[in-house]
């Protein structure tokens, strides 16, 4: 099984990655969301697992979220949306 690894800030991706970056900046998170993905073939099916790492802010520690789909570009959208949902829960009271 061949595994291809990819790390990206997804800076040029529209949609949820762009919205996630905008939200993290407004919440005082200085580091960019960092996407770490692995594409591989499992039993003849293309799969991709991406983890997005969100840096710490003045009031919260760093955290991460993982999602799985089929391609890196699509999985970045899914994991960014999942991170936005988590971000809303963490910062709900602020």
Where are the model-predicted features located?
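N-terminal segment of the canonical double-stranded RNA-binding domain
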Residues: 1-62, 69-77, 81-94
């Amino acid at each position: 099984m061949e595994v291809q690894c990819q790390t990206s800030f997804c800076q040029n991706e529209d949609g949820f990655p762009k919205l996630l970056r905008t939200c993290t900046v407004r919440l005082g998170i200085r580091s960019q969301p960092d996407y770490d993905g692995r594409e591989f073939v499992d039993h003849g099916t293309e799969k991709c697992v991406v983890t997005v790492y969100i840096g710490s802010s003045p009031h919260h520690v760093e955290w991460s979220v993982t999602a799985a789909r089929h391609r890196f570009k699509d999985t970045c959208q899914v994991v960014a949306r999942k991170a936005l949902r988590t971000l809303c829960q963490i910062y709900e009271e602020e």
